[in-house]
């Protein structure tokens, strides 16, 4: 599979906040992006193309269940090629769930769809 991973400005703002709070966040995200390039269909599908993926933050020490959530939007050019947009990231302790309607609004505001 050959999927390109891109970030949105909204994601970058939220990731910067988490990177300040958790020292290992940047390294955790790097590992996450590498795994996402290999398997973009991981996580739970919230709506067609929109997925919620659990991310463990090592410095938080709570594993995936208490870590962060990364929202992605996948556009497939074929079964083995496409783009994965990192739309949002949030700490599970700050928000318990993400509203699909708000996520769709963020995606459209970023000019992805």
Regions found by a protein language model. Name each.
Residues 57-68, 72:
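Arg/Lys-rich, often Gly-containing low-complexity segments of ribosomal proteins
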Residues 68, 73-113:
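Enriched for short, Lys/Arg-rich terminal
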Residues 37-61:
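A short, surface-exposed loop/turn module that caps and links secondary-structure elements
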Residues 14-18, 39, 56, 90-93:
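Alpha-helix C-capping/helix-to-loop hinge sites
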Residues 1-29:
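Arg/Lys-rich, positively charged N-terminal/basic patches that mediate binding to nucleic acids
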Residues 24-42:
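Compact soluble domain cores
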């Amino acid at each position: 599979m050959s999927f390109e991973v891109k970030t949105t400005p909204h994601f970058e703002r939220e990731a910067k906040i988490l990177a300040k709070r958790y020292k290992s966040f940047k390294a955790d995200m790097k590992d996450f992006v590498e795994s996402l390039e290999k398997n973009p269909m991981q996580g739970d599908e919230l709506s067609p193309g929109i997925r919620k993926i659990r991310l463990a933050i090592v410095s938080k020490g709570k594993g995936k269940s208490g870590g962060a959530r990364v929202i992605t939007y996948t556009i497939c050019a074929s079964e083995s090629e496409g783009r994965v947009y990192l739309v949002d990231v949030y700490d599970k302790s700050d928000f318990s769930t993400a509203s699909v309607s708000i996520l769709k609004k963020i995606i459209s505001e970023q000019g992805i769809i």
